[in-house]
UniProtKB/Swiss-Prot annotation:
Gene field: ispE
Name of this chain's protein: 4-diphosphocytidyl-2-C-methyl-D-erythritol kinase
Function: Catalyzes the phosphorylation of the position 2 hydroxy group of 4-diphosphocytidyl-2C-methyl-D-erythritol.
Molecular-function GO terms, alphabetical: 4-(cytidine 5'-diphospho)-2-C-methyl-D-erythritol kinase activity; ATP binding
Associated pathway: Isoprenoid biosynthesis; isopentenyl diphosphate biosynthesis via DXP pathway; isopentenyl diphosphate from 1-deoxy-D-xylulose 5-phosphate: step 3/6
Catalytic residue list: K10, D141
Coiled-coil ranges from the UniProt annotation: none
Keyword Transferase: yes
HAMAP family, per database record: IspE
Similarity remark: Belongs to the GHMP kinase family. IspE subfamily.
Keyword DNA-binding among record annotations: no
Taxonomy of the source species: Bacteria, Pseudomonadati, Pseudomonadota, Gammaproteobacteria, Enterobacterales
Top-rank EC class of the record's enzyme: transferase
Length: 283
């Protein structure tokens, strides 16, 4: 039997770089919120212990794909602790709507959905804390998708405090370029010493993203989309880009602006939600 599992997008409603560790990783403060929009992962169980991704991603080797890595990591961890039935495997396919290199967390969300779904389907019984710990080894953004609640994140993104920001409507636009995260984080002009503030203080301030100035400088497409969106509503970069978003109080306001978008702009309208669609589907 095939089951389907949501793999939602996220937005960074704000993102501030507060320092850089000796190992090169940047410390940050950011606010994650999910969207009721994303990829869909389909899983069909196998009884031969194999993991097969039926929808490979162009340019990504099978074993390097985060979906496959997440499945194998859970399999190895559960088997080592005697929590995996012999022969447990899966055929996995994905209906991909989220762009790669877009700052919407697509790959991290895919990995988290696979961890949560296979833990359920294989009846491994790993706790949410255990799954989040596994997720962190796959990527800094994976734990927030595993836990499934909007969160204020610190450290390199792994220290999470659940929060409930307003659930607004967003017009999310993709400029048609992919921005590798290292391109932003290695730029010498990236702000790296934004003062740390409490979540209470940050929620009262105007939101911004320290990566935005670099993305706009290096990618004229990002600058063009943001310049257009800012004529209509508060708008900013999510993550390290390339996607940008404008916020609205109602769906109709967001759709009216999308209808006026120039032909070169690709976008969609979605609602911000504090409970992940993945976790809502499991209630």
């Amino acid at each position: 039997m095939r089951t389907q599992w949501p793999s939602p997008a996220k937005l960074n409603l704000f993102l501030y770089i507060t320092g850089q560790r000796a190992d090169g990783y940047h410390t940050l403060q950011t606010l994650f919120q999910f969207l009721d929009y994303g990829d869909t992962i389909s899983i069909e169980l196998r009884d031969d212990g194999d993991i097969r991704l039926l929808t490979p991603v162009e340019g990504v080797e099978h074993e390097d794909n985060l979906i496959v890595r997440a499945a194998r990591l859970l399999m190895k961890t559960a088997a080592a602790s005697g929590r995996l039935l012999a022969g447990s495997g899966a055929n996995i396919s994905i209906d991909k709507r989220l762009p790669m290199g877009g700052g919407l967390g697509g790959g991290s969300s895919n990995a988290a959905t696979v961890l949560v779904a296979l833990n359920n389907l294989w009846q491994c019984g790993l706790s949410m804390d255990e799954l989040a710990e596994l997720g962190l080894t796959l990527g800094a953004d994976v734990p927030v998708f595993v836990r499934g609640h909007a969160a204020f994140a610190e450290g390199v993104g792994e220290i999470l405090t659940p929060v409930d920001p307003p659930e607004k409507w967003y017009l999310v636009a993709h400029p048609g370029v992919s921005i590798p995260t290292p391109v932003i984080f290695k730029d010498p002009e990236l702000p790296r010493n934004t003062p740390k503030r409490s979540i209470e203080t940050l929620l009262k301030c105007e939101f911004s993203n320290d990566c935005e100035v670099i993305a706009r400088k290096r990618f004229r497409e990002v600058d063009a989309v943001l310049s257009w969106l800012l004529e209509y509503a508060p708008s900013r970069l999510t993550g390290t880009g390339a996607c940008v978003f404008a916020e609205f109080d109602t769906e109709s306001e967001a759709r009216q602006v999308l209808e006026q978008a120039p032909e070169w702009l690709n976008g969609f309208v979605a609602k911000g939600v504090n409970l992940s669609p993945l976790h809502r589907a499991m209630l």
